[in-house]
Design a protein with these regions (language model features):
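C-terminal beta-strand-rich structural cap/linker in extracellular carbohydrate-active enzymes
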Residues: 586-609, 707-717
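Aromatic-lined carbohydrate-binding/catalytic grooves of carbohydrate-active enzymes
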Residues: 156, 160-203, 227-242, 246, ...
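Aromatic/acidic polysaccharide-binding cleft in carbohydrate-active enzymes
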Residues: 396-484, 530
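Aromatic-rich carbohydrate-binding modules that target alpha-glucans
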Residues: 609-654, 663-688
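Carbohydrate-binding surface patches
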Residues: 498-561, 601
């Protein structure tokens, strides 16, 4: 027989109602587009309080309007003629930081808006919150035959139109171990040759930086963390810093990255964790920052190198060395940004958990000889984002260096020598829908790991499409990247059409869906794989074809809550403008018509708080005689009007598993799981992230007892500590004063039929059961 412990307590009894959702109907907004207007902004991103200056080109009717949106919400609307003078006007966004906006120029009749043009605005005080990374890699004027400074202005104007907020300078330096070339007096030498014998003009490096800073972009220089040219000993590099390998006979030699014989040198590797090497490179970086106005350092590596050793023939842990190198660079220049490449994921856990500003993954089809596993499929990209989120404690964004049309580019730009537009757009659609970003844009589109190479050209149509796609990922950045992968889930979606619909990962000849919970919104992505069985993002030979564009697809989504509004937007339609959709809701089913699908359409369902209940289930709370995951006996958590925060004090068995759900029916409810298998709370670990996507990993505690458990579904976190029961005194009470068995309630006043170990209220007193 269990003893019950009471403490006098007068609860505020709450009456709860279980209301089934009635049918809800909503009408649609009619929208069309006639994209005759182009716009630019004076910066790629803005800090809160800055005004945005727009310049418009193209003819507009007299009744043209302009409106500013955050998501579907319209913040302001004006007659364009009242705010614009000489094709220019300004707008000051709200003061909120890290927000994306879409500006729509349109005309309107009684029943329809016609979009003439759109442009995005990013208000972010720090670019690392929503990085959109570009590159530059050419600093020559071809012997004076081209106007390089004019090219710099036009190239950066285009990157500004794409809202690129950070630019990587590839192959800008002189020698890897001595990037800045100085004369005997310590002054910059105006011209030098890089490792491939290309000429680099210091003037042009500086002018790129100045032009980028004008637009609010960050300028990041590139270098290896462990590279030196031949004869580097003449510049102070010590032989005992060398990274060594061992041949088949057991002889040690310095590891190196071989390059063509026509180039200036191979690259000879040093131990990145060697403190003397770190000091040497920190001094070189001081020279860089003293002569160039760079904002940070893009650190590179070469992936898995096999077994490697230091000068004393001790094994070197390269990933640990990378982390040490990053920390040394940050200590030397704490105000500068740092990014490091995780080549095929090598060393990612050490890199991402160190002091980098965001995650940067160079992905390959087969590890590219670097020892990595294949990352060629679209499905791999989500796994990389999830891993980065875990390694960074969900603090850092992911940028992919993913080279499109690689084999076509590597074979001299075979065929038409053009980048394949549908290959680019589907890859960019998937990366953005998953919450990532794609390093691809510079003075050309990146198709190879050697950034100066430009074997494939962009068509004008692709350049325009890039504007649409970068506008889209900037305007809707809060819906795409405002939460991490722990807020992702696999939506339950069906269609009455003949088209196949499946939840992530992509499936041949199907519409693939992916979703995230963002605030009070379910953000659903529809990705078009209906016309293809090619599930690789690489499109290596540039053979992907344009998909058919589908319209009027009937969709039904299981929502589990009351939906107030449904809207759609696509970079492929109406320049990304919002289109409100008619919908019906019957019970848990929300039905609407997807207006169009070419590569990618995003649908957002706005509604009330969907988490009215949260329960704990599993072996750790299992009742005798009942299955561990019988939701009828799950432990209910209570919400005291604290938004999406639920709490309970309950008994947990030692070393047994548990997780959380938002319902009592496995057919419809959502599970909130751990990110790691058998995640253990203890006296040192009281916080964990939860996720609704991926493996069904669960939590445990090492010691049986009563625990205070809090789950926050806004932050997607769970907090767990041992309960303090010192204030409770033991009083046995089985019946109420009237002699009848008293009813049980949770602490917040919810009736409980079957009390279990935990704190409840009975007969006006708090009970430890």
């Amino acid at each position: 027989m269990r003893k019950t412990v009471f403490l006098h307590f007068v609860p505020k009894y709450l009456l709860s109602f279980a209301l089934s959702l009635l049918a809800v109907y909503s009408s649609a907004e009619n929208i069309s587009s006639r994209l005759t207007v182009d716009m630019t902004t004076d910066k790629a991103c803005y800090i809160p309080g800055q005004s945005v200056v727009f310049v418009l080109s193209g003819n507009v009717p007299a009744n043209t309007m302009v409106r500013y949106r955050h998501g579907s919400a319209i913040l302001e609307t004006h007659k364009l003629s009242e705010v614009m003078s000489n094709n220019k006007w300004s707008w000051t966004p709200p003061m909120a930081d890290y927000q994306g906006y879409l500006v729509e120029v349109y005309t309107e009749t009684t029943n329809q808006s016609t979009i003439l043009g759109t442009i995005a605005v990013d208000v972010s005080s720090d670019w690392k919150r929503f990085p959109r990374y570009g590159f530059v890699a050419d600093f020559d004027n071809a012997g004076g035959s081209i106007d390089k400074n004019a090219n710099i202005k036009s190239e950066m104007a285009y990157l500004n139109r794409l809202h690129i907020n950070g630019v990587q300078f590839q192959d800008w330096q002189w020698m890897h171990h001595k990037p800045v070339k100085l004369d005997a007096h310590g002054s910059l030498i105006p011209w030098y040759q890089d490792i491939s014998n290309r000429w680099v003009g210091v003037e042009y490096v500086k002018n790129y930086i100045a032009e980028q800073h004008k637009y609010g972009m960050k300028s990041i220089f590139y270098n290896l963390c462990f590279g030196a040219w031949k004869n580097a000993v003449n510049d102070g590099v010590k032989t005992d810093w060398a990274l060594l390998k061992k041949d088949g006979s057991g002889n040690f030699y310095q590891d190196y990255h071989g390059l063509p014989s026509s180039w200036a040198s191979n690259i000879y590797l040093q131990v990145p964790g060697n403190m003397d090497w770190q000091q040497y490179m920190a001094e070189r970086n001081t020279e860089i920052y003293s002569h160039f106005d760079f904002d940070g350092f893009q650190i590179d590596q070469l992936g898995y190198r096999g077994d490697v050793y230091d000068a004393r023939h001790k094994v070197v842990d390269l990933p640990a060395s990378y982390k040490s190198f990053i920390q040394a660079m940050k200590s030397a220049h704490p105000d500068k940004d740092l990014i490091m490449n995780a080549v095929s994921g090598y060393g990612a856990d050490n890199i991402v958990s160190s002091d980098v500003d965001f995650c940067y993954n160079e992905v390959w089809g087969n590890g590219n000889g670097y020892g990595g596993v294949s990352e060629a499929d679209f499905a791999n990209l989500l796994g990389i984002i999830q891993a980065n989120d875990k390694y960074s404690d969900h603090q850092r964004q992911t940028v992919f260096a993913a080279y499109i049309n690689y084999d076509k580019a590597d074979n001299g730009g075979s065929g038409d020598k053009m980048v394949n537009t549908p290959g680019v757009l589907l890859t960019d659609a998937v990366i953005a829908a998953l919450g990532g970003s794609h390093l691809e844009m510079g003075d050309h589109m990146l198709t190879r790991e050697y950034f100066p190479a430009a074997p494939l050209a962009m068509s004008d149509a692709l350049k325009t499409a890039m504007v649409r796609y970068y506008d889209f990922q900037t305007a809707y950045q809060n819906f795409l990247r405002g939460t991490t992968s722990k807020a992702a889930y696999l939506p339950v979606v069906s269609t009455s059409s003949n088209y196949s619909v499946n939840a992530w990962p992509p499936k041949s000849y199907s519409i693939t869906t992916f979703a995230k919970k963002v605030g009070n919104c379910d953000v659903l992505h529809f990705l078009n794989f209906l016309n293809t069985d090619d599930l690789s993002w690489r499109d290596v030979w540039g053979t992907r074809t344009f998909p058919d564009k589908y319209t009027g697809i009937p969709i039904t989504v299981t929502a589990n809550r009351k939906i107030d509004k449904v809207w759609a937007a696509s970079p492929d339609s109406h320049a990304g403008a919002v289109q409100e959709l008619a919908f019906t809701q019957k019970g848990d089913d929300v039905s609407f018509v997807l207006p169009s699908l070419e590569f990618w359409t995003m649908v957002v369902m706005e509604g009330s708080n969907d988490e009215d209940h949260v329960y704990i289930t599993g072996e750790a709370v299992q009742l005798d005689g009942h299955a561990a995951y019988d939701l009828a006996y799950a432990v209910p958590m209570t919400n005291k009007g604290e938004g999406k925060v639920f709490k309970v004090t309950t008994y947990l068995k030692a070393n047994e598993l548990f997780k959380f759900t938002n319902g009592r029916d496995w057919r419809y409810c959502k599970s909130y799981c751990a990110e790691y298998k058998d995640y253990q709370f203890n006296s040192f670990v009281s916080l964990a992230h939860i996720t609704t996507l991926g493996e069904d990993f669960k939590f445990m505690v090492p010691e049986a007892g009563y625990y205070d458990i809090t789950i926050d579904l806004e932050k997607m976190r769970v907090y767990l500590t041992k309960a303090d029961l010192s204030g409770l005194s033991a009083i046995i009470a089985d019946k109420s004063p009237s002699g009848e068995f008293a009813s049980w309630y949770s602490v917040s006043g919810v009736p409980v039929d079957k009390p279990r170990k935990g704190i409840y209220v009975r007969n006006g007193r708090k009970v430890l059961f």
